[in-house]
């Protein structure tokens, strides 16, 4: 067993070292946030024993086999287009980043924060770390994000979506657009660290898969499984933080619009969980909970259930994928 004190400096030093020496790694960081279902504070998995990289066709079955091999612990991502493996759908929008639809790896090493230390069974933390000086990691190129969709195209899309709502075939929409920077050289670890300082959210992540990265700072728990218990905590309802936190929370809680959006997704999640849960076990544990984060207050509801016997965890994910707070409702028009 190897360990060093879990200072922020040691964590950042380790991430930089791993980024320099390995093609695959995944950092999971709660930023010290704890709730009743928290089980992990900080974890870095890296090195490559096996890799799964594929398009959406039969992706979930591939993932089941990948997980079951030696009962391996695996890390990775499921892209939005895996919806095409859950329903008879197709994708009209071409990806601008060309990430695999599913990308997972089994790591050689795992470092976890435990009782104030960074701990690893196999990786010698003290002997392998090396400091990267600040002048090597901070870059400030004069580049700006550009939207993929023009303003006029965006307005036309909104008109179309409004008509769908008016016609009644969609009743809640989460519309997303992309922004890009081309020919942008940067230090990804430095960008993640800046994001972490600005927005330290409980489900933050830095994933490297060959020469591609995902940087994430999310407050939302899609799914968690503890024993036979399934937990989903969709977010719908947001308000900016001001100096008067109590007034902020009351305004969000009493917003008819935000409550309507939230309860729609609660019903959608309950319906998704029916596919993978024992009959009669689905419960709304908390409705319209107000949670405070660095920049925002969020309305979060908690839905729990008991998983069906002998059901693979990947089947649970497939039953609920994509998450309702991302798709809107209904998922399929």
Over which residues does each language-model region extend?
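Extended alpha-helical targeting/anchoring segments
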Residues: 1-333
């Amino acid at each position: 067993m190897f360990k060093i004190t879990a200072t922020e400096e040691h964590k950042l030093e380790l991430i930089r070292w791993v980024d320099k020496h390995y093609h695959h790694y995944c950092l999971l960081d709660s930023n010290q946030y704890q709730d009743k279902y928290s089980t992990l504070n900080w974890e870095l998995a890296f090195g490559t024993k096996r890799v799964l990289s594929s398009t959406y066709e039969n992706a979930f079955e591939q993932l089941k086999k990948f997980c079951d091999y030696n009962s391996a612990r695996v890390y990775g991502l499921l892209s939005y287009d895996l919806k095409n493996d859950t329903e008879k759908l197709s994708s009209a929008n071409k990806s601008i980043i060309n990430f695999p639809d599913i990308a997972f790896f089994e790591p050689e090493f795992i470092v976890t924060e435990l009782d104030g230390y960074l701990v690893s069974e196999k990786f010698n933390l003290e002997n392998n770390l090396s400091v990267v000086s600040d002048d090597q990691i901070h870059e400030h190129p004069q580049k700006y994000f550009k939207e993929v969709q023009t303003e006029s195209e965006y307005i036309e899309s909104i008109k179309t979506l409004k008509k769908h709502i008016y016609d009644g075939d969609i009743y809640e929409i989460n519309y997303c657009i992309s922004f890009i920077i081309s020919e942008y050289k940067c230090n990804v670890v430095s960008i993640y660290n800046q994001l972490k300082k600005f927005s330290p959210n409980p489900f933050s992540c830095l994933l490297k898969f060959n020469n591609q990265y995902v940087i994430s700072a999310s407050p939302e728990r899609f799914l968690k499984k503890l024993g036979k218990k399934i937990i989903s905590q969709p977010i719908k309802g947001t308000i900016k933080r001001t100096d008067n936190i109590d007034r902020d929370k009351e305004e969000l809680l009493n917003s008819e619009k935000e409550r309507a959006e939230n309860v729609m997704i609660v019903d959608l999640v309950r319906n998704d969980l029916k596919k993978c849960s024992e009959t009669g076990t689905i419960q709304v544990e908390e409705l319209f909970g107000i949670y405070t984060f660095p920049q925002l207050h969020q309305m979060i509801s908690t839905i729990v259930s008991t998983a069906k016997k002998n059901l693979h965890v990947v089947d649970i994910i497939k039953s609920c994928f994509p998450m309702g707070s991302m798709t809107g409702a209904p998922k399929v028009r």
